[in-house]
Every structure is written in C-alpha cells, then in structure tokens.
Amino acid sequence: SRGEFATSYTPYQPEVSQGTLQAIFEFQTMVCLLTGMEIANASMYDGASALAEAVIMANRINRRNEFLVSSAIHPEYRSVVETYTRGSKFDLQEVPYTAEGGTDLEFILKNLTENTSAVVIQSPNFFGTVEKYVSLAESLSKNGTLLIVAVAEAISLGILKPPGERGADIVVGEGQSFGLPVSF
C-alpha cells in the first residue's frame, strides 16, 4: 500500500502539498478522459457515497424530488443512496430489471413525470450487463430529467464508450480497481 495516499481527504495547505495536489489533478484529468465528462471531482469516499451525492446534486440542479433508481444497481450503492436521502422529501422509485438483466427502460419511460429529477442506472450493472441507455438519455433530456450513471468497475471504462458520450449528465464511480486491492 502507498502510505502517502492513505486518506481520501484533499489537503488544506497547498503550499506544502504540491505533490498530492498534482496527483489529484492528473487523476481528475484521466477520469474526464475515461468518462467523457468535462469536469471531475476527487476525494469522495467511495462509489456508493459518490452516487448518493450525485442524487442530491441532481435535486439541486432541477429542484425536482422524484428519482427512478434501477434495481440493477449494486445493493450496497442503493442502500447508501437510501441512507443519505432518508428524512428528505426525495421519492426514490425502484425500476425493475428485465429477464436479460438490464434495467427496464420501458418502465422508466412510462413512469417519467414532470417532477422526475433523475434516472439512476449502473453500467455495467450488478449483473454485469452493459446498459443500453443512449435513446433513454435523449428522451430524458427532452423532459429536463438528468441521467446519472454509476460505474462500479472503473477498468470497464477502458473498453466501453464513455458514459458522457452516451448521454450521461452525471457519472460517478469507484476508483478502487485503479489501485492495489484492499490490504488489511
């Protein structure tokens, strides 16, 4: 394990942390290239908390309270989203998955309302299915609904078309696979 990167916190004194800040900048630049997004944030705890923060961010962007959350998202990610939003006015509606293991996109389109803030999916999802969401993204943008895509396995971004190029508005992920395995 690399001891100098033992924390997810961004250093507060840039004058004594140039090396760490440079590493974070390089990481964010690479994340932008892999996700197809214009900007990236670092220093979230993990992919699950990043997804929860993305849901809260979507609400702040469009002031809507309904979220359609795919049941094909990793259960631990969904649990963290539920924990973060408990006690708020957020309405998390579970979207079923199909027999093929993908999110039921027809269900999403049928249940989309003017108060739907975002649709939340994971690709590849918990079952390993690469979601087909380009046409969904186009439909959502007409409604002003955001598309949040979670990427639990960052290495997949090396072979899949970036979520940003497929219509995702917000992309979150887990960066563990870029480093060493957990060592405790």
State each model region's role.
Residues 49-184:
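Conserved PLP-enzyme active-site core in the AAT-like
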Residues 2-50:
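Conserved N-terminal alpha-helix of the aminotransferase class I/II PLP-enzyme fold
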